[in-house]
Amino acid sequence: MLMFQKPKGTRDFLPEEMKKRKNIEKKLRKVFDSYNFSEINTPTFESFELLSKKTGEEIRKQLFVFKDHGDREMGLRPELTSSVARFYINEFKNTPKPVKLYYFTNCFRYENPQAGRYREFWQMGSELIGSKKPIADAEVINLAIEGLKEINMDFEINIGHLGVLKGVFEKYDLSDDEGNEIRRLIDKEDMDGLKTALSRIESEKNIEISEKVFEVLELKGGREVISKLKEKLSEFESSVTALENLDSILEFVPHEYIINFGIARGLDYYTGMVFEIYGKREGARQVCGGGRYDNLIELFEGEPSPAVGFAYGFDRIMLNIDDFEVEEESIFVVPVKSSDMLLNECLKIAKTLRDAGKAVELDLMGRKLNKALNYANTKGIKKVLIVGENDILEGKVALKNMETGEQSLIELKDILTI
C-alpha cells in the first residue's frame, strides 16, 4: 500500500477528466457572460462567525473549522452565498443596481462521502443583488436553465415559493421554530416525520393544519396550479400574495417547468421563490438550487438589499453528461533524428502553431521515429508532423494521420491549415 493517499472525500482528476471539466466550465461561463454577470472569487476560508451567522452553532459539525495563529476561528467555505454577501457589503454597496456576480470555485463540507457527494466539491453560481422585481427572479431562473441547455444536459426544473406555506403557518399562528421544523422535514422528504410534527403541533395548539399543508404539497404541475391553489387558499392572504408573485415571475420564464411547493431548500436564508433542477439520469440527483433571499445582506449588517441567486453542483453536472464535444486536437511535432538543426526547426513550427492557438507537443525524449509514433498513439494524438532534413530544406514537412495511417508532404507556408 502506498504511504500517502488523498484525503477522504477528495479526488485526483486525470488529464482526460480535466479536459471534460474545462470544456463544460467553458460552455457555462459563456452563458453567464452572455447575461453580463461579472466573475468574482472570495477567500477559501472565512471567519466561523460569518459562516454560522444564519444557521448558528449547529453548522460546526458540517464544516472544516480551525484556528489561525492569532487564535481566530476560521472555516473552509461550504458554499458561496454568505461569502458573496460579505463581499457585496465590503465592495459593492455603492455600485449601481443590480449587481450581477458569478463564481466558479471549490467548497468544502465535512460529511460522509458517497456518489456525487464529496468533502471537496465545485460550485458555479450567480447572485443578482439590488432588484426585487419578478423579472430579476426570472432572469436567474432562465440563466440556470440556459446554462444546462448549452451543455445538452437532460433535466427537469421544479419551481416553488416559500411564501405559500409561510402564509399557512402565519394563519395558524405557528412560531418561527415550528415553521422551520416543518420546512426542514419537507426538505428532507421525511413525510412520516412531517406527519408526526404536524400532529404534535395540532395537539399543542388545538388546530387542524395538516390537511392544508398536504394540500399545498400535493398540488404540482404547470402554471395552472397557481389558480387552483389560489382558490383553495383564498382565506390565506399571504399565501395568495406569494402565488401572485410566483405567477408574475413565471410570466417571464419561456421554458418548461413544474410548479412544486414541496421545495423547501436546506438553507435557512431563502425568503420567496425557490427552485431546484434535477438531472434525468437514474436517481434524479439535484444539480442546481437557488431562490430569493431578501434578508441575508441585512443579516450581515449591510443595508437591506433584495437578492436572488443559484448554484450549480458542478460535480453532479459532470455525472449527468456522457456526450462531451472533443476540443481541438493536439499536434505532435517530432524530428526524424535528434539534431540541433532539426530541433530548432521543430521549435519554430511549434511556435507558429501555438501562436495560432493550437495545442502542440514536441518530442522531448529524443525517441526514434517508431517509438515517437507509438507515444502519439498512446496519448490519442491524431496528427503528427515529422520533420526531416531533406524535407525541411525544401520548405516541407510530413503530416501523418494517426487514425488512417496516411502520410503526405505539406508546405510549411500551409502549416496553419492542418
Swiss-Prot record:
<dbReference type="InterPro" id="IPR015807">
    <property type="entry name" value="His-tRNA-ligase"/>
</dbReference>
<dbReference type="InterPro" id="IPR006195">
    <property type="entry name" value="aa-tRNA-synth_II"/>
</dbReference>
<dbReference type="InterPro" id="IPR036621">
    <property type="entry name" value="Anticodon-bd_dom_sf"/>
</dbReference>
<dbReference type="Pfam" id="PF03129">
    <property type="entry name" value="HGTP_anticodon"/>
</dbReference>
<dbReference type="GO" id="GO:0000105">
    <property type="term" value="P:L-histidine biosynthetic process"/>
</dbReference>
<dbReference type="InterPro" id="IPR045864">
    <property type="entry name" value="aa-tRNA-synth_II/BPL/LPL"/>
</dbReference>
<dbReference type="GO" id="GO:0004821">
    <property type="term" value="F:histidine-tRNA ligase activity"/>
</dbReference>
<dbReference type="GO" id="GO:0005524">
    <property type="term" value="F:ATP binding"/>
</dbReference>
<comment type="similarity">
    <text>Belongs to the class-II aminoacyl-tRNA synthetase family.</text>
</comment>
<dbReference type="Pfam" id="PF13393">
    <property type="entry name" value="tRNA-synt_His"/>
</dbReference>
<dbReference type="InterPro" id="IPR004517">
    <property type="entry name" value="HisZ"/>
</dbReference>
<dbReference type="GO" id="GO:0006427">
    <property type="term" value="P:histidyl-tRNA aminoacylation"/>
</dbReference>
<dbReference type="InterPro" id="IPR004516">
    <property type="entry name" value="HisRS/HisZ"/>
</dbReference>
<keyword id="KW-0963">Cytoplasm</keyword>
<keyword id="KW-0648">Protein biosynthesis</keyword>
<keyword id="KW-0436">Ligase</keyword>
<keyword id="KW-0067">ATP-binding</keyword>
<keyword id="KW-0030">Aminoacyl-tRNA synthetase</keyword>
<dbReference type="InterPro" id="IPR004154">
    <property type="entry name" value="Anticodon-bd"/>
</dbReference>
<dbReference type="InterPro" id="IPR041715">
    <property type="entry name" value="HisRS-like_core"/>
</dbReference>
<keyword id="KW-0547">Nucleotide-binding</keyword>
<dbReference type="GO" id="GO:0005737">
    <property type="term" value="C:cytoplasm"/>
</dbReference>
<protein>
    <recommendedName>
        <fullName>Histidine--tRNA ligase</fullName>
        <ecNumber>6.1.1.21</ecNumber>
    </recommendedName>
</protein>
